[in-house]
């Protein structure tokens, strides 16, 4: 299986590269620079594509060219940026610069669509094509979050997923949107799960849990798929 992970240099993306795949599979990471401290066993092939999704068209072309020869089975789009004051009581839309709003829309929405458009012909050649979009609980109704550009971009991901399903259902394209709550991205996958789960005292999700969910999705047969999954922290009162 050839798996492409966009936004793979740190946090959840890095954990996905380290934690997914079986012997003989190829993991392809995408980020502006390859991280130096990846922990990957020798049984899986890891490649890297350096691309900056803040320049959507150029990045999409670069990534397409890098994976065209060997093909692609799964695209995991894990890239997203947010307002400088996001998740801070000081956040206010009126204080968010226009350039910041435009950058969020470009990176979180435009880049997603353009890259999928470029890679879709390759994906549809696979016997089991899959797209996994890492969204957010900020993209759910009554999320309780005020960040306008970030929230709108996560609602957009659900719309992208829904439209792709309708357009390519007969080609058996499986599209999943993961609505993730507050993640603990500072504790790496190499940390024992019981220790990682203590961080945040029930208010944060260890990356281990998300990796386990994605493993489950990738283990399904071609006869079914996970349409949408919401994964909040256990003490997140919004859900």
Where are these regions (language model features)?
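N-terminal Rossmann NAD(P)H-binding glycine-rich loop of SDR-like oxidoreductase domains
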Residues: 9, 17
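Conserved mid-core segment of classical short-chain dehydrogenase/reductases
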Residues: 81-102, 146
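Catalytic loop of short-chain dehydrogenase/reductase
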Residues: 95-98, 130-156, 161-162, 166-169
């Amino acid at each position: 299986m050839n798996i492409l992970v966009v936004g793979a240099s740190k946090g959840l993306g890095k954990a996905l590269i380290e934690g997914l795949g079986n012997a003989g599979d190829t993991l392809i990471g995408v980020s502006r620079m390859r991280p130096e401290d990846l922990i990957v066993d020798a049984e899986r092939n890891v490649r890297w594509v350096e691309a900056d999704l803040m320049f959507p068209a150029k990045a999409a072309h670069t990534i397409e060219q890098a994976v065209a020869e060997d093909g692609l089975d799964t695209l995991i789009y894990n890239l997203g940026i947010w307002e400088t004051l996001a998740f801070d009581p000081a956040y206010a839309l009126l204080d968010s610069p226009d350039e910041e709003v435009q950058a969020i829309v470009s990176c979180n929405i435009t880049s997603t669509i353009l890259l999928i458009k470029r890679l879709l012909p390759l994906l549809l050649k696979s016997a089991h094509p899959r797209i996994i979009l890492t969204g957010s609980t900020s993209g759910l109704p009554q999320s309780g979050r005020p960040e306008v550009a970030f929230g709108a971009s996560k609602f957009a991901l659900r719309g992208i997923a829904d439209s792709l399903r309708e357009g390519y259902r007969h080609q058996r394209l499986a599209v999943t949107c993961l609505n993730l709550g507050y993640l603990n991205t500072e504790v790496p996958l190499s940390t024992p799960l019981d220790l990682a789960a203590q961080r945040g005292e029930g208010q944060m999700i260890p990356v281990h849990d998300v990796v386990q969910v994605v493993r489950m999705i990738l283990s399904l047969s071609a006869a079914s798929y996970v349409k949408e999954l919401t994964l909040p922290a256990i003490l997140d009162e919004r859900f």
